[in-house]
Amino acid sequence: MTEHKNNKKRLLAWLLLAAALVLAAAALGMARFGMGVWPYPVAAAAAVLLIVAVAFLRPNWAALAATLASLAFLLRFAARGYAWWGYALLFVAALVVLHHFLPAVLWKIVVILTCIGLVYFCVVESFIIKNARTDADDGRDYLIVLGAAVYGDRPSLTLVRRLEGARDYLQQYPDAVAIVSGGMGPGETVAEGQAMYDYMTAHGVDPSRILIEDKATSTEENLVNSFAIIRERGDEPQGKVAIVSSAYHLYRAKLFAQKFGVSDAAGVAAPWGYFFVMLNYFIREAFGVTHFWVFGN
């Protein structure tokens, strides 16, 4: 009787695993052909089925590593905004494999290096989190809004939240002028700066209070070009600039501002989005900050 039950559980587990693979393939296809939000719930359902199947199978190390790698694959390719969760799971899967194959001495070295890496990661995140807030409470003259993805001519959700933060600031400080900064990237039919201008004017912001910068393709260029616009107006950015961006991005944006001589740029944190998506970008930002510390850009 027990063996019969175990066989039924194994059969159910393999059926669930097959269903998970079908749903995963469907999610990837939907994402590939741009089918709106549908890839996300389908990918989530695939992940749930995969986890349940693994629970039934009671996996050995190889099955556990394969499961983690499969979940990482789903998060990386089928769920927009969760790629760095996928990388994290892939790293854990690699640790599972290394634990099985490495001699004890080498495994201890891997554990020590991993712990050092985690401590370093926490240190970097402390700087990012400390600056992930609005500190522009003194009415700066210029508000630089950093661009983000545009789908065709439509601002992404991340960019919309930045624009909402900028609009709120302009309402609070009626003498401030916004500089919307961003060039045209892949898949975009208008420059990000123009898309931001169109969105803000359509949502009640006076066009005379918005200056367009439409050439920048990076945070560095956003700030260099925006500072140049301020100087062309006969002004200096020092003491007069606030930067609008996603909360996780403000620390690095301020580092770039300091690099170009504006040591007191304030930050305006855009409203937060989905919690786990935001955590994904906080994870990613640690690598961006590290790149700046090492290479200066």
What are these language model-derived features?
Residues 2-8, 53-60, 100-110:
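Membrane-interface helix-boundary motifs at transmembrane edges
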Residues 1-44:
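Membrane-anchoring hydrophobic segments
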Residues 278-297:
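A transmembrane-helix-recognition feature enriched in membrane-embedded lipid enzymes
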Residues 20-29, 67-78, 117-122:
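Aromatic-anchored segments of alpha-helical transmembrane domains
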Residues 11-14, 60-64, 87, 105-115:
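Alpha-helical transmembrane segments of integral membrane proteins
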Residues 89-127:
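Non-catalytic propeptide/linker segments at domain boundaries
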Residues 33-100:
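Membrane-embedded alpha-helical segments of integral membrane proteins
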Residues 105-107, 116, 123-282:
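A structural signal for short, hydrophobic/glycine-enriched beta-strand patches
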